[in-house]
Regions:
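N-terminal, charged low-complexity regulatory/assembly segments
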Residues: 1-192, 199-201, 232
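Generic, ordered loop/turn and secondary-structure boundary motif
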Residues: 17, 192-194, 216, 258
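A general structural signal for short secondary-structure junctions and capping/turn motifs
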Residues: 175, 198-203, 221-226
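Secondary-structure transition/turn motif
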Residues: 196-197, 238
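Extended mid-to-C-terminal alpha-helical interaction segments
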Residues: 211, 216-349
């Protein structure tokens, strides 16, 4: 078991944030793995895996670099730096940190990831490993993440809001629940980070950050370049309901009944969500979502309750009945049943 010792001040200052680089690295790890965690990820792999494999087939040094850097229990540190969590850190700025890695550091990190196995001779003296890694991540970003970034960002923001709401209502135990395998709050200033055996780390004075990603990937990272204060980060997968891009479409009958925006909100409220989460997931404005919620609540289709500092909305039994009715489809058509009669039948004149 590996754990971090975290002081009360470090934990109190911990926060959730977004990182385009973390999202792109998670996409790279998914392409490298080549298997899908859910149907939406399968469709994404079908669209991008052939081009990714063709790219590496034409570039053997980079293909070997990826195989050495992304190991089952350890990533090469230079490839997964702790994100800053700063709102103004865009993808090019984050990528520059990888590109600027000294070549000797990159080779040492690869050797560490190999856990005692020798670094392949083809990589042992290369000075372009950071540039190759950065170029590959840039390709993954431009080809597979950037075209879908607005939707991904809304999903990530919704996850951050959900975790923050849990933090407000149940503390860090609730906020960390189910975040990644092996991670849980042990108490006594200890955060278990993995079920694997790793030396304990002292995080006194460090910045503790949590970054969601939409692929089903997770890892840990921390600063090793001597910066002050150092950052330690947990990258974790969004909850499945938020991360899967293939949510069932809003039924046309529900759209005809309620209008498109209102129907989309009702469909999302099978599980409790806040107004801000709904804004993030639907892309609608705050005012529009607020009006839809008021109408649905007045109609008895949704109810609200307070959870800590957040107000959460969820479908009522009446709302569930409406959704079931429009998603079940029409009853099978057939000839009308004969009308039952009592006594003698009559014939019209």
């Amino acid at each position: 078991m590996g754990w971090w010792e975290i002081t009360a001040d470090t934990l109190a200052a911990g926060r959730f944030a977004l990182s385009p680089l973390a999202e792109t690295t998670a996409a790279l790890k998914t392409l490298h793995r080549g298997t899908a965690a859910h149907p939406g990820e399968r469709a994404w792999l079908d669209a991008h895996l052939p081009a990714y494999r063709a790219l590496l087939a034409a570039d053997p040094p980079t293909a070997l670099l990826v195989r050495c850097a992304l190991r089952p229990t350890w990533n090469a540190t230079f490839l997964t730096p702790a994100p800053t969590g700063d709102a103004d850190q865009d993808f090019p700025a984050e990528l520059a940190r990888i590109r600027d890695t000294p070549p000797a550091t990159a080779r040492a990190d690869l050797a560490e990831a190999l856990a005692g196995a020798p670094l392949p001779a083809a990589l042992r003296h290369r000075a372009d490993l950071p540039e190759r890694a950065a170029a590959l991540l840039d390709w993954v970003w431009r080809r597979t993440v950037l075209p879908d970034w607005p939707r991904r960002r809304r999903v990530l923001e919704a996850d951050v809001l959900a975790r923050t709401a849990r933090l407000g209502s149940g503390g860090w135990v609730a906020a960390l629940d189910g975040m990644r395998p092996g991670l849980r709050w042990l108490g006594a200033n200890r955060l278990q980070i993995t079920a694997h055996d790793h030396p304990a780390r002292q995080l006194t004075g460090a910045h503790l950050l949590f970054f969601p990603v939409t692929p089903q990937q997770s890892w840990l990272s921390w600063d090793t370049d001597g910066r002050t204060p150092p950052r330690s980060a947990v990258v974790y997968p969004c909850s499945g309901a938020l991360a899967e891009p293939d949510r069932p479409p809003v039924p046309g009958a529900l759209t005809a009944l309620l209008g498109g925006g209102r129907a989309a909100v009702l469909m999302l409220l099978g599980a409790p969500k806040s107004t801000t989460q709904l804004v993030a997931l639907t892309g609608q404005g705050l005012g529009s979502v607020g009006r839809h919620l008021q109408v649905l609540r007045d109609a008895g289709l949704i109810a609200r309750r307070r959870a800590g500092r957040s107000v959460l909305y969820r479908r009522t039994d009446a709302g569930e009945a409406v959704v079931r009715a429009v998603t079940a489809g029409p009853e099978p058509s057939g000839p009308p049943s004969p009308t039952p009669t009592c006594g003698r039948s009559t014939r019209s004149r």
